[in-house]
Structures are given as structure tokens and as C-alpha cells.
């Protein structure tokens, strides 16, 4: 661990101005990002007596080897820059909001000709509008089933929709009145979209207008003696009212608001959010965070508002499906310290005025108390789980260190597994665990090349060589003149200019004199008064430390593991160790874990290490091995499926994936496409006469088969 005094900024070098600061470790990774009204006051607090610091803060400052800062003009700029850097660098010591679970949402595919309604937990997609999240999937599915009577929109997948279009008969929902059956032309695209838009209006909280409209139509139908239509509208009204009863009115004035509450102790905190739209609870979410420093409720509120609404705005922009991520009102237990800056920033995201308030009395105060009770309950459950989890992970790492005779606990573990079927479509996976927790953003996969001929042993050796050759390449020191050694990439620049972004403001690194240009409008980016070898990262230092000098971010293979786990026995472990020896790497421990008996093999050892069946170390190794196994199998299946689906179309020049998809979608199958004439092919959008003739000739020459091809992908990064 580093002594904070070795990189403490020299007296007088830290400006007394608002700004954003970032601590980095010996490899140049940013490990913490923070902002302050006064950089001098805030940074000085980190270099006080270590015994008086929060445990996580103490761990952070002793892990760091340097600190840099950026001066900004306003607190809003500091807020924006802090959020951007946290999102970019993903610092390990910053507050991380982790969902207690993946909450279900209701999705509406507005980008399709016939929009579909469905419940999902998956990633957000462009052109899809989302409602929720909801606490229980069964509840939203029950509500959706009830509302399909009123809004008979499509809920089937693209495959089911296409199949029923071809056979000319609707599915069961079409027969029982819960789908308008656009697949067989009962309604056209415009009419179906109106149904979907009414559904979206209802879920967005505009219920009164819809109910008045249906009530008016029901009375009109009754007056015109259309009793069947009036009865159907009456049933629709009843279904709507039943659905609304499931969402109790909590704020009688039709308020749109998010109600946020916290429960915390000195090490962690839980946050709960109730999303109120039109006075009704439309969604609920919960997170748990690890505190880095002694943080009160007001500071927690500020950080949560910044991260949560920043991410929601990014998702809304990505989905491009309308709606605003920020409500008119945000209710919090305590106002953030920089409430005006937060309010201004939120108003910018919304495109209209946003009020951040603390409810004092009435319904809003009662609702806040309800959310606080939920937060306390969630926090209690989290602490019960976390107590066992932290203890188990710490014990597992210590047991591994002792059993394998390692110098330090293996804080970073990598595992390699190979997957194939009888030597075909040979692929490998590499998974990463840090502090006993999967680091999925650093998972990698490999398409095995020449090593496949040597079976699992040859494949393992190839993957190890490729992974660690990249590590050596990305961390090799540069030669004179800016050229890296041992196959390293050439240095990006000569001299000592570190360009973070462009705007012409320059700040001087203490004790070095190298210039730095920071992001934003006139932001001065300054490195702390550190020793000569640990000042701002120049392009040459970046090459040595594995930091990309253009982006300032770690390269993909820049950090070696403390322990390399191979899914296999002694032969596989020996192959991995030999590959490392060839590369001159001697500081990475290698083991193999054999299936069935769960034996741990060390290279060149005649007997395995037997870990107790109930040990936390064995359980951790099994988790790592299983994660690599699952990741490899998924890639193998994907690669095999791609090869099996390859056809004559793949070899036609000028025919890309989009055009191939358009052809198959238009004709339904390759067989029907072969039977098509040139004129029929040219009728497909995007196909001219010449392209149609090329396709027709290629299919005629290819006959009825068309050999499959294996498209090797190399490393997927």
C-alpha cells in the first residue's frame, strides 16, 4: 500500500476553486472521482491522519499513488464533469448503485409497423418505449392481460406474427378478442397504432381523458340502440377501472413525482424510489451502495440524483421513443448541498422546470414515510446477505493464498476454458474475477486458430500466448524516438503534451512543467505535486502502464492476473505455464481445476492439491470455472449456429447482411427465393435490375445446397 504523503500535493499548488478530482493507482487506473466547491479544502481532507478517515476512504488513499484535478467555472459544470468521468472510468471506489434485482418493465415497440406489447427484463433498445419498472412480473402481466380487452394490440413475437400472416388465421388471442389480429388484416397499420397509442396514454397516466371518451361513446351507442357495442364499451370501462384500482391513488392532485428515501449506516446505504405518475404509483426500484467516505443523507441524495437521472436520460436518448426521464417534482428526505445546481441540471435534462423538495406534511409526507420503511426493510435484508458474502469472499481468497503458497491473496483471477464439438468451431473464453466478484466488462472470447489441431492442450496454449502477448505489447516501455519495444505499439506523441480534449486551456503539472488540456470550456487540468516519476501520465508513461494515451483509459489486456485458472487437469495447466515461460512471464500463478473430482493441479506437480469440499476457496474456483464454461459454450453455440446458417447468399458479391435479411424476409425461405424470377427479386426494396440478375444467377449456379462456411472471428474485444 502507498503512503499518501508520497503523493500529497505541494502546499499552495491546489487551487481554492470548484472542480473535479480523480485519484489513480500505480497502473494509471482511475480509482475514485469526486467534485468539490473548493478543491483545496476537499483534497486536504484526504491527507489528514489516516486513523480519522472512513474505512473505505482510508483504503482508497492508500491504494492510490497520485491525484489530479480539473478546475471548472461553475458547480453545474463540476456536476456534469463528475458524472461523465464516473461513467467513463467506472472507478472502483466510487458509489455504485446495484439493483436488488432486475426489475421487469413493460415494453412497446413503437419502431415496428405493428407495435408489440411485452414484459421484459432485458436491455433498453432504440425505438422502444418502456413503462415501469415494476416490483413483480406477475402483477404487470396480469394487468396487461386485463387491458388487452380494451386495447387489443399485438403481443406476439415476430416469428409468430409472420407464421399466422402466412397461414391466414389469427392466434387464440385474436379469436377471443384480446388481439385486433393485424397479422390477417382485421385492422390496418394506422388503426393498430391508434390502439397502441391509447394504451401508452393510459400507462402514462392520462386515464381520465380515456375514461371520459369511452363513457361518452358508450352512452352514444346506447342512444343509437347499438346495445352490443354499448355493452362491450361498458365492459371495457369496467376493465380499466379494475386496472386502476391495482394502482392506488397516493397523491390526489394527479402529481408526477419521484419519491426517494434512504436507509444507511457508516459503510453502506440503501435507496428506494417510487415513481408516481398521475397521482398513482407506476413503478418502484431499489439499490444498495457502498460508501467511500462519511456521507450524510443530503450528500447521498445529490449523488443519487446525478447518477440515476443521468443514466435515465442516456437510456431515453438511446431508446429514442419519447417521454422524459425526469418528472416535474422530485421528493427527497433532505435537500442536496448544491440544490440549485442539481435543480438546474435536472431541468436541463427534462427540458422544463423541475422542483426538488422535502415533503413536510400531508399525503406527500405520508408517502415519503412509506418509501423510507421500504428502504429500511431492503437495507436490513441486504446486510444479512452481505455479512455472509463478504466473510465468504475474504475467507476464499485467504484460503487460496495459503493452499497454493501465493505471496499475496489472488485479488484478480482469470480463467480460460475451451469449447468445441469433436474439434469443430473451437473457441475459448476468458473470464475475470476481482475481489471474488465477476468483472463482466473484462470478459473476453477467442476463436482458436492453429492451436485447435493440438486439442484442448494446444488450444489452451494458443489462448494463453495471445492473451499475454497482448499484455506485453500494451505495457512495453517505449524506445527512444517514441517506438515501443518487443512489438509494442508506437508511442502516439513525442514530448510531454497530454491532450485530454480540446479547448485551449492549459494547466501546469506541479514539479514537471508538462502541459495538459482538459475537457470542457476553459477547464484547467492539473496534476498534483507528486514525485518526478509519478506526475501526469505522458504518452510514454501511458505505454508503460497500459493506459491509452489518446483516451486515458486502460487498454483491454493491460493488467495481469494474480492467478490464472485453467479448466482442465495437469496437461492443460502445464501447457499454460509453458506458454507463460516462453513469453518470459514468471509472476503469474497457474493452476488447473479438473472436473468430477475437483482436483487442483499445479504445473509440474505429480500430485494435485485437494481442497476440502466445504471450503470457500473451492467454491470460488468452481464459480470462476463455471462462469468461463458458460461463457465459452454460449460463444461456441453462436459460432456454430452462424456457420450452419451460412448459405449460397453469403458468397454473392455486393450482398451484405442487410440485403440478405431483406431477401429472406420478403420470400420467407431460401427455397422460395430460388424459385423467384429476376423481376420478383428486383421488386424487393433496395434491389435494382443488375443486383437481381446477380442474385438469380448465383442461386441458379449454386443448385439446391450451397456449402456452409466457417467464418472465424478471431478475438472479440
UniProtKB/Swiss-Prot annotation:
InterPro entries: GIY-YIG_endonuc, GIY-YIG_endonuc_sf, GIY-YIG_UvrC_Cho, Hlx-hairpin-Hlx_DNA-bd_motif, RuvA_2-like, UVR_dom, UVR_dom_sf, UvrABC_protein_C. Keywords: Cytoplasm, DNA damage, DNA excision, DNA repair, Excision nuclease, SOS response. GO terms for biological process: nucleotide-excision repair; SOS response. Residues 16-95 form the GIY-YIG domain. One of its GO terms (cellular component) is cytoplasm. SMART domains: GIYc (SM00465), HhH1 (SM00278). The UvrABC repair system catalyzes the recognition and processing of DNA lesions. UvrC both incises the 5' and 3' sides of the lesion. The N-terminal half is responsible for the 3' incision and the C-terminal half is responsible for the 5' incision. This is UvrABC system protein C. It comes from Saccharopolyspora erythraea (strain ATCC 11635 / DSM 40517 / JCM 4748 / NBRC 13426 / NCIMB 8594 / NRRL 2338). It is found in: Cytoplasm. Residues 541-553, 707-717 have a biased composition (Basic and acidic residues). NCBIfam families: PRK00558.1-5 (NF001824), uvrC (TIGR00194). PANTHER family: UVRABC SYSTEM PROTEIN C, UVRC/OXIDOREDUCTASE. It comes from the Bacteria.
Amino acid at each position: 500500500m502507498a503512503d499518501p504523503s508520497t503523493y500529497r500535493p505541494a502546499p499552495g499548488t491546489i487551487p481554492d476553486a470548484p472542480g473535479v478530482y480523480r485519484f489513480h493507482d500505480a497502473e494509471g487506473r482511475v480509482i475514485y472521482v469526486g467534485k468539490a466547491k473548493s478543491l483545496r479544502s476537499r483534497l486536504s481532507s484526504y491527507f489528514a491522519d489516516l486513523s480519522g478517515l472512513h474505512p473505505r476512504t482510508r483504503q482508497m488513499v492508500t491504494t492510490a499513488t497520485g491525484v489530479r484535478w480539473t478546475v471548472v467555472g461553475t458547480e453545474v459544470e463540476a456536476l456534469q464533469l463528475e458524472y461523465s468521468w464516473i461513467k467513463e472510468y467506472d472507478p472502483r471506489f466510487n458509489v455504485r448503485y446495484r439493483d436488488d434485482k432486475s426489475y421487469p418493465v413493460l415494453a412497446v415497440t413503437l419502431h415496428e409497423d405493428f407495435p408489440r406489447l411485452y414484459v421484459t427484463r432485458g436491455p433498453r433498445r432504440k425505438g422502444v418505449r418502456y413503462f415501469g419498472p415494476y416490483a413483480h412480473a406477475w402483477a404487470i402481466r396480469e394487468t396487461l392481460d386485463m387491458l388487452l380487452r380494451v386495447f387489443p394490440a399485438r403481443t406476439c413475437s415476430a416469428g409468430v406474427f409472420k407464421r399466422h400472416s402466412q397461414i391466414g388465421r389469427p392466434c387464440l388471442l385474436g379469436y377471443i378478442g384480446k388481439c385486433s389480429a393485424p397479422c390477417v388484416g382485421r385492422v390496418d397499420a394506422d388503426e393498430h397504432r391508434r390502439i397502441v397509442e391509447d394504451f401508452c396514454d393510459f400507462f402514462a397516466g392520462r386515464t381520465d381523458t380515456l375514461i371520459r371518451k369511452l363513457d361518452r361513446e358508450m352512452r352514444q351507442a346506447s342512444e343509437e340502440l347499438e346495445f352490443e357495442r354499448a355493452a362491450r364499451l361498458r365492459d371495457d370501462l369496467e376493465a380499466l377501472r379494475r386496472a386502476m384500482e391495482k394502482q392506488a391513488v397516493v397523491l390526489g392532485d394527479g402529481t408526477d413525482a419521484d419519491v426517494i428515501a434512504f436507509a444507511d449506516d457508516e459503510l453502506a446505504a440503501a435507496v428506494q424510489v417510487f415513481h408516481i405518475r398521475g397521482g398513482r404509483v407506476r413503478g418502484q426500484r431499489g439499490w444498495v451502495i457502498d460508501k467511500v467516505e462519511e456521507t450524510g443523507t443530503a450528500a447521498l441524495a445529490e449523488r443519487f440524483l446525478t447518477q440515476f437521472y443521468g443514466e435515465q436520460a442516456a437510456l431515453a436518448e438511446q431508446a429514442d421513443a419519447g417521454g422524459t426521464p425526469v418528472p416535474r417534482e422530485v421528493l427527497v428526505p433532505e435537500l442536496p448541498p448544491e440544490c440549485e445546481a442539481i435543480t438546474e441540471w435536472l431541468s436541463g435534462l427534462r427540458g422544463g422546470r423541475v422542483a426538488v423538495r422535502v415533503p413536510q406534511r400531508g399525503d406527500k409526507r405520508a408517502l415519503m414515510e412509506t418509501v423510507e420503511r421500504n428502504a429500511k426493510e431492503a437495507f436490513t435484508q441486504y446486510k444479512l446477505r452481505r455479512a455472509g458474502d463478504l466473510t465468504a469472499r475474504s475467507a476464499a481468497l485467504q484460503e487460496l493464498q495459503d493452499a497454493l503458497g501465493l505471496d499475496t491473496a489472488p485479488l484478480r483471477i482469470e480463467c480460460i476454458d475451451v469449447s468445441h464439438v469433436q474439434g469443430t468451431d473451437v473457441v475459448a473464453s476468458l473470464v475475470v474475477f476481482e475481489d471474488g466478484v465477476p468483472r463482466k466488462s473484462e470478459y473476453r472470447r477467442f476463436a482458436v486458430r492453429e492451436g485447435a489441431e493440438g486439442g484442448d492442450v494446444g488450444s489452451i496454449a494458443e489462448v494463453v500466448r495471445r492473451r499475454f502477448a497482448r499484455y506485453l505489447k500494451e505495457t512495453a516501455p517505449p524506445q527512444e524516438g517514441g517506438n515501443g519495444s518487443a512489438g509494442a505499439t508506437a508511442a502516439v506523441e513525442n514530448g510531454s503534451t497530454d491532450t485530454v480534449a480540446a479547448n485551449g486551456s492549459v494547466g501546469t503539472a506541479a514539479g514537471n512543467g508538462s502541459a495538459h488540456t482538459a475537457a470542457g470550456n476553459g477547464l484547467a487540468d492539473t496534476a498534483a505535486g507528486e514525485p518526478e516519476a509519478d506526475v501526469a501520465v505522458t504518452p510514454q508513461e501511458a505505454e508503460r502502464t497500459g493506459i491509452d494515451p489518446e483516451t486515458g483509459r486502460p487498454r483491454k489486456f493491460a493488467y495481469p492476473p494474480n492467478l490464472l485458472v485453467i479448466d482442465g487437469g495437469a496437461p492443460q495447466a502445464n501447457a499454460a505455464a509453458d506458454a507463460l515461460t516462453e513469453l518470459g512471464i514468471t509472476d503469474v500463478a497457474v493452476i488447473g481445476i479438473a472436473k468430477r473430482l475437483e482436483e487442483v493441479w499445479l504445473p509440474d506437480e505429480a500430485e494435485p492439491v485437494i481442497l476440502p469440499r466445504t471450503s470457500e476457496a473451492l467454491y470460488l474456483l468452481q464459480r470462476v470455472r463455471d462462469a468461463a464454461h458458460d461463457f465459452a459454450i454460449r460463444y461456441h453455440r453462436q459460432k456454430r449456429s452462424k456457420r450452419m446458417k451460412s448459405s449460397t447468399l453469403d458468397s454473392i458479391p455486393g450482398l451484405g447482411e442487410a440485403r440478405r435479411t431483406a431477401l429472406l424476409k420478403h420470400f420467407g425461405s431460401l427455397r422460395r427465393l430460388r424459385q423467384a424470377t429476376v423481376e420478383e427479386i428486383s421488386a424487393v426494396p433496395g434491389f435494382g435490375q443488375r443486383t437481381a440478375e446477380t442474385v438469380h444467377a448465383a442461386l441458379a449456379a449454386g443448385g439446391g445446397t450451397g456449402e456452409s462456411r466457417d467464418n472465424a472471428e478471431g478475438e472479440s474485444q
